[in-house]
Amino acid sequence: MSELRGRRRIPKLHWNEMDPAEQEAAVKTLAGLDGFHLVAIGSPVPRRRQERARARCLRRLVLELSAFDVELLVLESRTATLNARDVETVKGARFDLPKGTAFRVAHEPGKDEPLLWAADIVAGAIKAGKDGRLGYRRLIEDLVYEIAVETDC
């Protein structure tokens, strides 16, 4: 994943900062890796309720990941306050898991863990598909499981 930076001196990859050729290369790189991507897509997401929508999506993601026997979710770190909010959301979601199920969340800076860029690439490809640019989505369609989340925001 690190090679996707190219010759640019950037700390981490951002889908919205890539040109179409770079986006395609990123999706092709991702398609060549082992893995399966669960994507929680919340709607509606009003600008003033983004954190609430994120929490609803994160809660659903915990339930889905646990069903695949995932025990650790690594999220890209944000601020200490927002990271703590994520942790509280995961703690709350664990009450809906079967008794004795292990599940935890950790935060890592995006610049330190290139595998976190996969989430940005998948989200970008899915958003592009919803905007009518289906090529990116088609490259990874067999690797993605989309979960629609009603955010009630």
Model-assigned labels for residue ranges:
Residues M1-C153:
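Phosphate-ester processing/binding pockets and catalytic centers
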